[in-house]
């Protein structure tokens, strides 16, 4: 993984500080700033997955956000590799670049039918407008409609992208958006 080493010289120390304050720490993996999409060497790609997971476990990160901007968005592989470390690392699936957003498959073969991530985004990027906010909220509905076998449930929650609190026109709009989220 890449990071601004001049700004963050000691990520493990930062994680330890967060833990000492009773907080959890998360890493934003394969973000859209680094488009690792042109690599075709399978050995190199597999090494990136393994080295990234080793870093997350060694530095004791608690959560990782997997964005859909690069070729490293195989959530089942990420989950399997993280499970092998013995350290619980929560996975946020943000594969939003594949509309409609990729939700959990009820037949995950590698995970005994269980969702390989802890929460997943159901919408495209949210904008600071009510139509965008309402569209994103609506994108979660299809994952909760089957009450017998919901695909949004404890351990595998659907969410409608980030909050736009502070970016809306009024305090009341911000509060309504926060409350609905």
Model-derived segments and their meaning:
Residues 79-96, 100-181:
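Active-site-proximal substrate-binding groove within the catalytic cores of carbohydrate-active enzymes
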Residues 1-74:
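Aromatic-lined carbohydrate-binding/catalytic grooves of carbohydrate-active enzymes
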């Amino acid at each position: 993984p890449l990071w601004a080493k001049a700004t963050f010289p000691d990520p493990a120390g930062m994680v330890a500080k967060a833990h000492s304050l009773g907080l959890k720490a998360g890493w934003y993996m394969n973000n859209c700033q680094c488009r690792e999409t042109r690599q075709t060497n399978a050995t190199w790609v597999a090494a990136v997955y393994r080295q990234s997971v080793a870093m997350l476990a060694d530095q004791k990160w608690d959560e990782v956000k997997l964005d859909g901007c690069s070729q490293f968005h195989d959530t089942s592989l990420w989950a399997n590799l993280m499970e092998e470390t013995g350290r619980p690392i929560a996975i946020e699936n943000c594969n939003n670049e594949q509309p409609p957003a990729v939700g959990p498959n009820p037949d995950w073969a590698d995970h005994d039918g269980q969702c390989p991530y802890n929460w997943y985004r159901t919408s495209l990027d949210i904008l600071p407008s009510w139509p965008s906010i309402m569209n994103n909220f609506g994108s979660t509905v299809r994952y909760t409609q089957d009450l017998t076998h919901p695909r949004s449930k404890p351990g595998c929650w659907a969410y409608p992208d980030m909050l736009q609190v502070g970016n809306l026109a009024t305090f009341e709009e911000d509060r309504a958006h926060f409350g609905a989220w």
